[in-house]
Amino acid sequence: MAKIIQLSDDLSNKIAAGEVVERPASVVKELMENAIDASSTVVEIDVEEAGLSSIRMIDNGVGIDAEDCKLAFQRHATSKIKDENDLFRVRTLGFRGEALPSIASVSHLEMKTSTGEGAGTHLVLQGGKIISEKKTSGRRGTEIVVTNLFYNTPARLKYMKTVHTELGNISDVVNRIALAHPEVSIRLRHQGKVLLQTNGNGDVRHVLAAIYGTAVAKKMVPLHVQSLDFEVKGYISLPEVTRASRNYMSSVVNGRYVKHFPLVKAVHEGYHTLLPIGRHPITFIEMKMDPILVDVNVHPSKLEVRLSKEQELHELIKQGIKDVFQKQQLIPSASVPKKAPMPAIKNEQQSLTFDAKKGNTNEMETPLSYEPEPLESVVYETNQMSTYGMPVQEMTGASSPVFREDAPSERVHKEESAASLEYEESVLREDDAEAISENERVPVMYPIGQMHGTYILAQNERGLYIIDQHAAQERIKYEYYREKVGEIEQEVQEMLVPLTFHYSKNDMLIIEEHKEILTKVGVFLEPFGSGSYIVRSHPQWFPKGEEAELIEEIIEQVLVEKRVDIKKLREEAAIMMSCKGSIKANRHLRNDEIKALLDELRQTKDPFTCPHGRPIIIHHSTYEMEKMFKRVM
């Protein structure tokens, strides 16, 4: 008796649906991609109970011809590709011909479609089988309603998350597709409540504002670099705007949102030490390339891709981001509380609000008598910021990057007009031009004194500056050590008393395997008995008293990483040395020492953050100070 049988179409579609339709968000993604491929300029999505009850998608695309409607629900039937050559030059979002049959096989599906010429078609399917077909009248476009999702696959239904989680996944998908296609007007509603509305004018800045709020959108700067093979453009947040999750980082390849970790890594390397440890920027990066350089036929979900010349693209993104921030003045401003009537005192914790509007510099009075003579400065005001790296919406408990029903301030059509966003960005561009022309990213500051032996207070005609003295010297020393450590030199310092290090036999095998790498960084290990090494010299740049700890740290990196990145090793060594050798808290400095420290800081390449990404300088403008003291209203 034969053991191998041909699976039925119904069972085959259910198996395929397991890969294509993982959750309601998968249905939304596939239907939106079909709508965009159909040249739609308006797409409306209505969901009930996070899509488990109903998903309704309406578009104004080209529609489907009557003779093609039934075929559209057959597996691997598509209008996107014709032959094998097309498969390697995919220019559409869909191409596999699996979405509609997979969705229909695990739901009740109803479709009305019309090309605008003659009668349209109305199909009703259950479990992938057509149970009703009739002609209908209607405008050009397609309407698809999916209900009772996973009704015939209870195992999949059992593993669905909460309504809030599934709705968050849907919002995430819609938001990223909206970013990838700002030329399409997209509206997402849940239970009749609008979660996202974009205007489809083609300006991605307005989509960013609609998703993250204008306060965040104003703190994002444009990125645009290109090479012979790649064009990279988008918007990246200033280092002061960070999140605890990578979910706020969006990558788009030829109009397709993708998840590709090497691209995320390139962005992080571009920010380098500007980001605090464990924090991530908000970014939207769109990459355009010849379709032959990208393979999208990796997984049925089409989220994964393989890229040719990936290292070239990696370097282009990394260097592009570095170049952007070299032209920016990155001193974050302190926030000013929003003016509001005094609330009644209650026996409960009161929430804080912040003023999102920027002070008008034209209203600033002439410098007060205690200020030095006016200096030319490149400092411009930034907007709503509660603490470094934590914008207001994070403090109010909005943790999801995409679904925040309780954060109306993050919706541009409810907060500020698009004209306001454009005006603010034009102001930032003017300030950038000033910074470039004056070639002075950190203004001259005049020391006032110290606070708690930890923070330096300084001033100029623009207001008050608070400088973390440890972070400032850490940046100075880091750049010094990074240059020294970065040099491949064989100069070593002999030690009067050799150092001994003990390791297990397994660790010694790893060390022996990577001994050549250790030698390149100036660490020479000699076997010394069983399970021990002796070191008689060290690189000349090692600071006195730190030799043993540095050597141990370098060897530990070899043991943990297995494959050692020498550049990363030297980077970590420079960070460690700069941190250990910098001024500690409660160290009181003389005014001449403070002035020397500030002068050295101004000479560094990245004077705004320490090597760990913490801010060095916080700015309180004169206007903000006067507003707090009610000198201006």
Curated annotation (Swiss-Prot):
SMART domains on file: DNA_mis_repair, MutL_C
PANTHER family, per the entry: DNA MISMATCH REPAIR PROTEIN MLH, PMS, MUTL, DNA MISMATCH REPAIR PROTEIN MLH1
Family: Belongs to the DNA mismatch repair MutL/HexB family.
The keyword Nucleotidyltransferase belongs to this UniProt entry's keyword annotation: no
Entry protein name: DNA mismatch repair protein MutL
Record keywords, A-Z: DNA damage, DNA repair
CDD domains to which the protein is assigned, alphabetical: HATPase_MutL-MLH-PMS-like, MutL_Trans
The keyword Repeat belongs to this UniProt entry's keyword annotation: no
One function term, GO molecular function aspect: ATP binding
GO BP annotation list: mismatch repair
Phylogenetic classification of the source organism: Bacteria, Bacillati, Bacillota, Bacilli, Bacillales
Record-level GO cellular component terms: mismatch repair complex
Role summary: This protein is involved in the repair of mismatches in DNA. It is required for dam-dependent methyl-directed DNA mismatch repair. May act as a 'molecular matchmaker', a protein that promotes the formation of a stable complex between two or more DNA-binding proteins in an ATP-dependent manner without itself being part of a final effector complex.
Pfam families (alphabetical): DNA_mis_repair (PF01119), HATPase_c_3 (PF13589), MutL_C (PF08676)
